[in-house]
């Protein structure tokens, strides 16, 4: 049987003439599940019931816009020649780091307006962010994007992957199978989610769950990015995601060390104020 016939169609279904892509469905599913989990913890930690929903009404669209701006700016040579494609986000091309920057800035401004500690909210939201990223990476899988370098089919079989994943990792235009880097990052984030949920019970200083997320995600992204073939570059061989990841690690570690030394007495995660 033709291998291409076994691959997943990136279009899930049609609403009349409008194609609904798996990519969009998975992104939306990730946001919804992240909200449900985050909302439960937010109320438990004493935030108003509508706080997280109000924040997401601003953070989600701003994050998507920032993610697209980040991606387009890194490939401006292409988009300056094809401006009509700038809005085609349904075909992929949104950068997670751009989305995170947009979300963090929005959350910081929102919490300042509401007179709520940003780090309190960031700690609550950190596991939910990972949930969104875990699911969102499968949108890349459906679109056959964000993959790594060539590998043999035997390599993928040795990873004990099911056939439907192996088949999707065959890229027709390359004529080869590729590293499922989307899966590596999704699994890395799943491990990170488990770690953060454990850290919640330790009752760390305020901000340390969020900074731990920043460190964990950045370490994984740095190494996995080095395997990808579609990286966005800043200058020469410098990959933008790796540079941002280094910054994330430094900021996360630096913030934990600084606050442990300078912020006394420190608020704890379980302090509902």
Curated annotation (Swiss-Prot):
Q: Report the enzyme's class at the first EC level.
A: transferase
Q: Quote the EC number.
A: 2.5.1.145
Q: Which UniProt keywords apply?
A: Cell membrane, Membrane, Transferase, Transmembrane, Transmembrane helix
Binding-site positions, a 1,2-diacyl-sn-glycero-3-phospho-(1'-sn-glycerol): 137
Provide a Gene Ontology MF annotation, just one. phosphatidylglycerol-prolipoprotein diacylglyceryl transferase activity
Checking InterPro entries in the record gives: Lgt
Q: In which pathway does it act?
A: Protein modification; lipoprotein biosynthesis (diacylglyceryl transfer)
Cellular compartments annotated: Cell membrane
User: Gene Ontology terms, cellular component aspect?
Assistant: plasma membrane
Q: What are the TM regions of this chain, as residue ranges?
A: 18-38, 47-67, 89-109, 116-136, 178-198, 207-227, 238-258
Q: Topology in the membrane?
A: Multi-pass membrane protein
Cross-referenced NCBIfam families, in alphabetical order?
Answer: lgt
Q: What does this protein do?
A: Catalyzes the transfer of the diacylglyceryl group from phosphatidylglycerol to the sulfhydryl group of the N-terminal cysteine of a prolipoprotein, the first step in the formation of mature lipoproteins.
Which family would the database say this protein is a member of? Belongs to the Lgt family.
The protein, known as: Phosphatidylglycerol--prolipoprotein diacylglyceryl transferase
Q: Which organism is it from?
A: Lysinibacillus sphaericus (strain C3-41)
